[in-house]
Amino acid sequence: MKRIIVILLALLLLLTCLACAKKPAQEAAAALRVGALKGPTSMGLVNLRKAAENGELTDTYTFTMVTDASELAASLAAGDVDIALIPANLAAVLYNKKTEKGIEVIDVNTLGVLYCVTGAEGISSVQDLAGKTVYLTGQGTTPEYSLRYLLDQAGVTDCALEFKSEATEVAALLAADPSCIAVLPQPFATVAMVQNGDLKEAFSLSESWDAVSGGSRMVTGVTVVRKAFLQEHPQAVERFLAAHADSAAKAASDAAGTAKLIAEYGIIEKEPVALKALPKCGVSCLTGAEMESALKGYLEVLFRADPASVGGEVPDSGFYHLSSPQG
């Protein structure tokens, strides 16, 4: 009997050890330095930021918000930030530099934020831009490439594009003459319409893209992580992804609370404007295969327009971190 008891205890101990062996070691809490570009790209982050400040998350966070994406590129290269929310094409450019301090994309944080705004009648689609002049910013960058792609897909060959250096210049043109046709990013599009009741949203370039792109999406912003940090703190990155997904979801489920935080953190000065603009700002958190499908097709369009816009080539599969957030 004693021998049987000893054997049973030994088997129980062995099973316990095997069960424990299957569980990965729990990674200690990490300190994450997150950099974000001021605007729609950082709107989906505000609920996560507040949760971190309230001590509700496992890891500790330091947040930096800038107005120039090149600052974030420099910070990534120097190892001064671990995770950054940057324009999609900039992520491709940085990846294609093939430096030791490489990056991977972990999610798409912002979809399309470009809107056609005008007071003119009869403008409700890309096709309606035939024979018209459109004012916009971003010559030689993604706004131009995106609009030209949509015009090409619609068979429009006689739309003139007039470029201005700042969105505020385009907004001023609309204020002076509401019959002008403009393409503006959020939140400038919402601000222009709030300030001038004669203006209206004619159509969303993002929705127009979805209708003709065959599965890709118009991607404004992505979240990248330094590979070195990902290798050292894989569980912390997964926890960030889960928290970011929750934060983006809350932007939809609690728009008022999110708008309050957007104003609190200085992304948009006035809370009512933030509340009105938020649903139009493409806040999202696409991960895994959905992220890759959305982003790859978009970068291919940019590559065909100007290879330099994505760093000379469409990034290979190593660009995409395909793990999905775990709750």
Model-derived regions, located:
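Secondary-structure end/capping motifs
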Residues: 230-305
